[in-house]
Amino acid sequence: MNQKDTRKETLEFNKLQKRLRRNVGNAITDYNMIEEGDVVMACISGGKDSFAMLDILLNLQKAAPIKFEVVAVNLDQKQPGFPEHILPEYFETLNIPYYIVDKDTYSVVKEKVPEGKTTCGLCSRLRRGTLYSFAEKIGATKLALGHHMDDIVETMFLNMFHGSRLKAMPPKLRSDDGRNVVIRPLTYCREKDLIKYAEHKDFPIIPCNLCGSQENLQRQAIKAMLIDWDKKTPGRVEAIFKSIQNVSPSQLADRELFDFVNLPLDRDGSREEYEFSEAVVSSTNIDESLFIDVTNI
């Protein structure tokens, strides 16, 4: 690569980095994800998204107007072939506090899920429960997950097509028991940007299919659909995401969100005070010159 190409590549990466940092900063501000004194537990799986999230959070931490801590946590689920040395070595180079949590959820999943079925759903639930418990143990006030805009839109369509529910992933969520708050700092970030960012940063990425399970085929189909839309109509994924931010319950059909039963008219006077006028036009007095001869069309 010549000097001109190197300069161009550096310029493009700088633009990408600024865009991602700006998107993360805006998401944090819009949803009040991180507050003064927070201990943010960054959940690192070893994939491109969580690596990028950690990298961006650490950079924003240096310039943020508030003080907060970032603690990296990886859950070692004892999958066969998982390179246990990679993440500790990486965290050491960053000189940040970190924990490796050993929890053999792999054996549980293999025992519960029939052969040939995807294990991702149960694996995810077990992982979430373990991380919730560990967050309390270390005093973390926020759990940061690496889901991005594409994940959120994909999840919405998954729930629509296969669950008949208009539901996605919220940027910020309080757990059902009220004991943890989950944040998704990459909410405004596109996956294609994160792929480029990870490639340039050369993160030590660990594949997520060490367990032998394949990604849910339904999600694969939706991901392919969004990629196709993105090629044919750039900006469509962003537009769909914005629609999630601009919901009009009265224009949908959920009776729990909007009271369609009690819709009184805002009019003065009683119904008896109104009079009906005669119809202006009836079927017997229409001007026949207005008709169009369509026999030869």
Curated annotation (Swiss-Prot):
Disulfide bonds: none annotated. InterPro entries: Rossmann-like_a/b/a_fold (IPR014729), TilS/TtcA_N (IPR011063), tRNA_Cyd_32_2_STrfase (IPR012089), tRNA_thiolation_TtcA_Ctu1 (IPR035107). Binds 1 [4Fe-4S] cluster per subunit. The cluster is chelated by three Cys residues, the fourth Fe has a free coordination site that may bind a sulfur atom transferred from the persulfide of IscS. It catalyses: cytidine(32) in tRNA + S-sulfanyl-L-cysteinyl-[cysteine desulfurase] + AH2 + ATP = 2-thiocytidine(32) in tRNA + L-cysteinyl-[cysteine desulfurase] + A + AMP + diphosphate + H(+). One of its GO terms (molecular function) is sulfurtransferase activity. Its EC number is 2.8.1.-. Its cofactor is Mg(2+); [4Fe-4S] cluster. A motif (PP-loop motif) lies at residues 45-50. One of its GO terms (biological process) is tRNA thio-modification. It is found in: Cytoplasm. [4Fe-4S] cluster binds at C120, C123, C211. Keywords: 4Fe-4S, ATP-binding, Cytoplasm, Iron, Iron-sulfur, Magnesium, Metal-binding, Nucleotide-binding, RNA-binding, Transferase, tRNA processing, tRNA-binding. GO terms for cellular component: cytoplasm. Pfam families: ATP_bind_3 (PF01171). Catalyzes the ATP-dependent 2-thiolation of cytidine in position 32 of tRNA, to form 2-thiocytidine (s(2)C32). The sulfur atoms are provided by the cysteine/cysteine desulfurase (IscS) system. Homodimer. Belongs to the TtcA family. This is tRNA-cytidine(32) 2-sulfurtransferase. It comes from Vibrio parahaemolyticus serotype O3:K6 (strain RIMD 2210633).
